[in-house]
Curated annotation (Swiss-Prot):
This is Photosystem I P700 chlorophyll a apoprotein A2. Chlorophyll a B1 binds at residue 654. P700 is a chlorophyll a/chlorophyll a' dimer, A0 is one or more chlorophyll a, A1 is one or both phylloquinones and FX is a shared 4Fe-4S iron-sulfur center. Belongs to the PsaA/PsaB family. One of its GO terms (molecular function) is magnesium ion binding. Keywords: 4Fe-4S, Chlorophyll, Chromophore, Electron transport, Iron, Iron-sulfur, Magnesium, Membrane, Metal-binding, Oxidoreductase, Photosynthesis, Photosystem I, Plastid, Transmembrane, Transmembrane helix, Transport. Its main location: plastid. InterPro entries: PSI_PsaA/B, PSI_PsaA/B_CS, PSI_PsaA/B_sf, PSI_PsaB. Its EC number is 1.97.1.12. [4Fe-4S] cluster binds at residues 559, 568. Chlorophyll a B3 binds at residues 662, 670. It is a multi-pass membrane protein.
Amino acid sequence: MVLRFPKFSQSLAQDPTTRRIWFGIATAHDFESHNEITEERLYQNIFASHFGQLAIIFLWTSGNLFHVAWEGNFESWVQDPLHVRPIAHAIWDPHFGQPAVETFTRGGAVDPVNIAYSGVYQWWYTIGLRTKEDLYTGALFLFLISAISLIAGWLHLQPKWKPNIAWFKNAESRLNHHLAGLFGVSSLAWTGHLVHVAIPASRGEYVRWNNLLDQLPHPQGLGPLFTGQWNLYAQNPDSSSHCFGTSQGAGTAILTFLGGFHPETQSLWLTDIAHHHLAITLLFFVAGHMYRTNFGIGHSLKNLLDAHIPPGGRLGRGHQGLYDTLNNSLHFQLGLALASLGVFTSLVAQHMYSLPSYAFIAQDFTTQAALYAHHQYIAGFIMTGAFAHGAIFFIRDYNPEQNKDNVLARILDHKQAIISHLSWVSLFLGFHTLGLYIHNDVMLAFGTPEKQILIEPIFAQWIQSAHGKTSYGFDVLLSSTNGPAVNAGQHLWLPEWLKAVNDTSNSLFLTIGPGDFLVHHAIALGLHTTTLILVKGALDARGSTLMPDKKEFGYSFPCDGPGRGGTCDISAWDAFYLAVFWMLNTIGWVTFYWHWKHLTLWQDNVSQFNESSTYLMGWLRDYLWLNSSQLINGYNPFGMNSLSVWAWMFLFGHLVWATGFMFLISWRGYWQELIETLVWAHERTPLANLIHWRDKPVALSIVQARFVGLAHFSVGYIFTYAAFLIASTSGKFG
């Protein structure tokens, strides 16, 4: 018998319906459920696939470099970063005739092109790249790394090169390798690149392999390092009149602690960034030598965790049993990794605009907006994935005997208190925030705006003041004129920091008022409700009062039949599915807030946000409607403009989003009846009935159809907002 797809599941391969195809795709990456899988093969397959993932990433970044070098305008952009528009790549087949060709021929190009809103130009410029040849060299290097990664992936699937299970479960060696070997060494390498290539380039010196050993990054070379006079590396930094990319106003320091921003580029000082990476290097080198491996020195993680028993007895057996639970569960490890990465990605979004590290990126408003929204959406998907794998851990990997009375078991014991508290917080935030907004709307509608309830965020303002913002008049900590912290930091980073914090033209510590207070609590509502759904899904994954035997049904099940009412929509997968809608809504509010606040800042019109953000109609009218008006009129009978493609994407995104509801509202029976009618028509239509199918067409399962609906909702939602964000920002600022 010829083996049919999927080869990993014999029962599915013999399924006579189209379920074979769709369910085969759905479970292709659920290695644990495949026939003939062993724990060792599972680890080996995942390990090898990591190299494939790296190959894809390196090929993608190589492609970015190659296309900008080939079709971009990097060299002319370098000459005038604030006025030349960076080109991402050419448009080979501009549709819609001559008007389209003229519209999209920009950035000094002779043919239609796309403008780059990714920030790669600013990144490459900051790290010392200056010519097309630099970009081609980088593209070739990354292409080779991609090929090597592919070979490494293939190699680690060969019998001789497959690591054994003990190698994968050696937690201490893995920690040391990742901390010191990956994070530590790569941070040191990056410090080296900044010191030897990027900082000299910012001072007008072009350093490459052919002159690397001739051009000393610091006049005194390695002398201060070996004589212990490290402070010499911080002396004579770039002056405030430094012209980036030239020797005008340049200093000689390579590792500084200046604080604040370079006046011309509005980005962090490169010498501060190099210092930061060197400090991280040292931290990770220390961390990478803390765990016991070959020489019997350092911590044993198992002993460390087993010793964590709080003496008061209020946490039972503390962390006992956690080592084996964690080390033997890939889902637990993945859940922790995703939770960490999700938080980190959101922090990246927050820091990229408030403390920009790339030269001139702060003045490229569309790029700033695009990068913020991009990283926040990615963070949302990663965070929901963390809870999904946490739930799968509880269903597939959790052993109650192994974890008796430890912190994990006690979380399960207290789940009803945890879930009900999250519910209470969500209800409180929702009713009060919506109540305030609606009250304010009614007051505006009745022509009495002075009767709005406007609450100043005094605690947040106090925190900003403690960090040095003086406009609120709190006179506390760093905003105090004569405190110990102020006096201690006067000769270090403080003067530049205080200048940056109190500069109204950047995004560091924006001035906040009643509108910010309200939207902050709306976002808090979204975050807490998303968390409630995710936490409930994970903690109830093994069973609940309603369905104590839930774990026997697995991660995703639609219902337990008609004889057991109330068991629909309560699988852990359903919780993940519901949470994604809340996650998308929450990040919608986050990005609306960020974007509107910044649009008014960039247009020097902050009073619009301050006055209109305190009621819902203000958001709908002065943010959404006002900024989408160009999109709604993006193409018309009189021709087209550079926003037309975004206008089309805005429309198309809405259509994809709306298609999602078709799958979310109509269930399996409707589609099965429709399919059977189409089959009847097919069999009776001449010519068409010459084609026969091997798999009997059947409707998707309830869970699969929900996933299709969710995918359309998510993709359409993001497409719609991406088009709105880029068009409304670039339409105003170019």
